[in-house]
Amino acid sequence: MAVVKKRRNVVVGEVHIYATYNNVIVTIADQQGHVLVTTSAGACNFKGSKKATPYAAQETVARAVKAVVERNGMRTVSVCISGPGAGREAAIRAVQTCNLNVTSIRDTTKLPHNGCKLPKRRRV
Protein backbone atom coordinates (compact mmCIF):
# COMPACT_ATOMS: atom_id res chain seq x y z
CA MET A 1 0.00 0.00 0.00
CA ALA A 2 1.45 3.34 -1.03
CA VAL A 3 0.98 6.01 1.62
CA VAL A 4 2.06 9.63 1.19
CA LYS A 5 4.54 10.51 3.94
CA LYS A 6 3.31 14.02 4.67
CA ARG A 7 0.76 14.02 7.51
CA ARG A 8 -2.06 16.50 7.14
CA ASN A 9 -5.42 16.71 8.81
CA VAL A 10 -7.86 16.03 5.97
CA VAL A 11 -11.49 15.74 7.05
CA VAL A 12 -13.18 15.55 3.63
CA GLY A 13 -11.92 13.42 0.75
CA GLU A 14 -12.71 11.25 -2.25
CA VAL A 15 -12.49 7.48 -2.66
CA HIS A 16 -11.85 6.38 -6.25
CA ILE A 17 -12.51 2.68 -6.90
CA TYR A 18 -11.53 1.11 -10.22
CA ALA A 19 -12.90 -2.44 -10.46
CA THR A 20 -11.71 -4.39 -13.49
CA TYR A 21 -12.37 -8.03 -14.32
CA ASN A 22 -8.94 -8.94 -12.92
CA ASN A 23 -8.21 -6.51 -10.07
CA VAL A 24 -9.49 -3.69 -7.86
CA ILE A 25 -7.56 -0.43 -7.46
CA VAL A 26 -8.46 2.00 -4.66
CA THR A 27 -7.16 5.57 -4.45
CA ILE A 28 -8.07 7.99 -1.67
CA ALA A 29 -7.43 11.69 -2.26
CA ASP A 30 -8.33 15.01 -0.70
CA GLN A 31 -10.72 17.45 -2.38
CA GLN A 32 -7.92 19.09 -4.36
CA GLY A 33 -6.96 15.72 -5.87
CA HIS A 34 -3.74 15.14 -3.89
CA VAL A 35 -3.39 11.38 -3.39
CA LEU A 36 -3.19 10.21 0.23
CA VAL A 37 -3.35 6.41 -0.16
CA THR A 38 -3.43 4.06 -3.13
CA THR A 39 -3.62 0.27 -3.04
CA SER A 40 -4.85 -2.70 -5.04
CA ALA A 41 -6.05 -6.22 -4.37
CA GLY A 42 -2.67 -7.57 -5.50
CA ALA A 43 -0.88 -5.35 -2.97
CA CYS A 44 -3.14 -6.79 -0.25
CA ASN A 45 -1.78 -10.32 -0.86
CA PHE A 46 -4.56 -11.53 -3.15
CA LYS A 47 -3.02 -13.33 -6.11
CA GLY A 48 -4.35 -14.66 -9.39
CA SER A 49 -8.09 -14.99 -9.85
CA LYS A 50 -8.71 -14.17 -6.17
CA LYS A 51 -8.00 -10.50 -6.93
CA ALA A 52 -11.25 -10.21 -8.88
CA THR A 53 -13.52 -11.39 -6.04
CA PRO A 54 -15.88 -9.15 -4.07
CA TYR A 55 -14.13 -10.17 -0.85
CA ALA A 56 -10.80 -8.89 -2.20
CA ALA A 57 -12.44 -5.57 -3.09
CA GLN A 58 -13.95 -5.30 0.38
CA GLU A 59 -10.63 -5.99 2.14
CA THR A 60 -8.69 -3.64 -0.14
CA VAL A 61 -11.07 -0.74 0.51
CA ALA A 62 -11.14 -1.47 4.25
CA ARG A 63 -7.32 -1.37 4.47
CA ALA A 64 -7.05 1.87 2.51
CA VAL A 65 -9.78 3.60 4.51
CA LYS A 66 -8.31 2.43 7.82
CA ALA A 67 -4.90 3.82 6.85
CA VAL A 68 -6.25 7.21 5.83
CA VAL A 69 -8.48 7.53 8.91
CA GLU A 70 -5.56 6.77 11.23
CA ARG A 71 -3.06 9.04 9.45
CA ASN A 72 -5.21 11.94 8.31
CA GLY A 73 -8.39 11.81 10.39
CA MET A 74 -10.77 11.63 7.43
CA ARG A 75 -14.46 11.60 8.32
CA THR A 76 -16.46 12.45 5.19
CA VAL A 77 -15.97 11.02 1.70
CA SER A 78 -17.57 10.97 -1.71
CA VAL A 79 -17.20 7.71 -3.63
CA CYS A 80 -16.38 7.60 -7.35
CA ILE A 81 -16.54 4.11 -8.85
CA SER A 82 -15.65 2.98 -12.35
CA GLY A 83 -15.14 -0.28 -14.18
CA PRO A 84 -17.23 -3.38 -14.80
CA GLY A 85 -15.68 -5.62 -12.12
CA ALA A 86 -17.34 -7.96 -9.66
CA GLY A 87 -16.23 -6.03 -6.57
CA ARG A 88 -18.15 -2.81 -7.20
CA GLU A 89 -21.00 -3.29 -4.74
CA ALA A 90 -18.79 -4.90 -2.10
CA ALA A 91 -16.37 -1.98 -2.28
CA ILE A 92 -19.14 0.57 -1.76
CA ARG A 93 -20.50 -1.43 1.18
CA ALA A 94 -17.01 -1.57 2.69
CA VAL A 95 -16.71 2.23 2.58
CA GLN A 96 -20.08 2.60 4.30
CA THR A 97 -19.19 0.15 7.08
CA CYS A 98 -15.90 1.90 7.95
CA ASN A 99 -17.59 4.65 10.01
CA LEU A 100 -17.24 7.25 7.26
CA ASN A 101 -19.96 9.67 6.25
CA VAL A 102 -20.61 9.03 2.54
CA THR A 103 -21.99 12.16 0.86
CA SER A 104 -22.32 10.90 -2.71
CA ILE A 105 -21.71 7.87 -4.90
CA ARG A 106 -20.86 8.50 -8.57
CA ASP A 107 -20.48 5.92 -11.32
CA THR A 108 -17.98 7.10 -13.95
CA THR A 109 -17.71 3.90 -15.99
CA LYS A 110 -16.94 4.72 -19.60
CA LEU A 111 -19.37 3.11 -22.03
CA PRO A 112 -18.96 3.28 -25.81
CA HIS A 113 -21.89 4.58 -27.86
CA ASN A 114 -21.12 2.01 -30.57
CA GLY A 115 -17.51 3.13 -30.86
CA CYS A 116 -14.58 1.10 -32.18
CA LYS A 117 -15.06 -2.23 -33.93
CA LEU A 118 -14.18 -5.20 -31.72
CA PRO A 119 -11.35 -7.52 -32.73
CA LYS A 120 -12.44 -10.56 -34.73
CA ARG A 121 -13.51 -13.57 -32.71
CA ARG A 122 -10.90 -16.21 -31.96
CA ARG A 123 -11.44 -19.61 -33.60
CA VAL A 124 -10.09 -22.69 -31.84
Swiss-Prot record:
InterPro entries: Ribosomal_uS11, Ribosomal_uS11_bac-type, Ribosomal_uS11_sf. Disulfide bonds: none annotated. Coiled coil: none annotated. Keywords: Ribonucleoprotein, Ribosomal protein, RNA-binding, rRNA-binding. The keyword Translocase does not apply. GO terms for biological process: translation. The keyword Metal-binding does not apply. One of its GO terms (molecular function) is structural constituent of ribosome. GO terms for cellular component: ribonucleoprotein complex; ribosome. HAMAP family: Ribosomal_uS11. Part of the 30S ribosomal subunit. Interacts with proteins S7 and S18. Binds to IF-3. Belongs to the universal ribosomal protein uS11 family. Located on the platform of the 30S subunit, it bridges several disparate RNA helices of the 16S rRNA. Forms part of the Shine-Dalgarno cleft in the 70S ribosome. This is Small ribosomal subunit protein uS11. It comes from Anaplasma marginale (strain St. Maries).
